[in-house]
Amino acid sequence: MAAALQLPMVEGDDFHPPANVARMREGIALTDADRVGWLAQLADVLQQHPAGAVLGCSALKRAYRDSLRNAVPGLRFVYLHITPAESLRRVAERPGHFYPPSLVTSQFEALQDPSGEPGVLTLDGTAPLDQVAARAAEWIKALQLATCPRPTASP
């Protein structure tokens, strides 16, 4: 998606503070308080890219998404809908990552489905990656066209 939009890709996991990473490695789910600084860092990173960026992050709760929306006007979200079982399978295939499969259930318990919120596109997260990326990029491009001022012809 980032490549299709010619935008930088930002991986949200790279911005977790060491204390959060340690908690997750130990199988301890993050609290809202644990995420405050992380969300602020993500907002800062997005603000450093005024032309746009693609951010990959969980943004599980509406409050987290609203925090990012308030910091970055015009922010849009692509929600990849998958089942807990599919998520567990994918996490298990990431050996060496600090996020253990044991935390998948807690993420789904915390998840507030963003479908229906303004500025959210919900896609089937089990569809082929190239199709998901293309659909998301098409949506963003259409939004950009809809919000860009169009030149008017001179008489």
Locate the predicted segments by residue.
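Conserved substrate/cofactor phosphate-moiety recognition/catalytic segment
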Residues: 2-44
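Conserved beta-strand scaffold positions in the cores of enzyme catalytic domains, especially
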Residues: 9, 14, 77-79, 120-122
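Conserved nucleotide-binding/hydrolysis micro-motifs of P-loop NTPases
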Residues: 16, 60-61, 82-87, 128
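Loop/turn-to-beta-strand initiation segments
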Residues: 49-53, 76
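Short amphipathic alpha-helical segments
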Residues: 65-70, 89-93, 134
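Conserved phosphate-donor/acceptor-positioning beta-strand/loop module used by diverse small-molecule
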Residues: 71-91, 123
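Small-molecule kinase domains that catalyze NTP-dependent phosphoryl transfer to phosphate-bearing small molecules
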Residues: 93-137
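C-terminal accessory "lid"/substrate-recognition subdomains
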Residues: 140-155
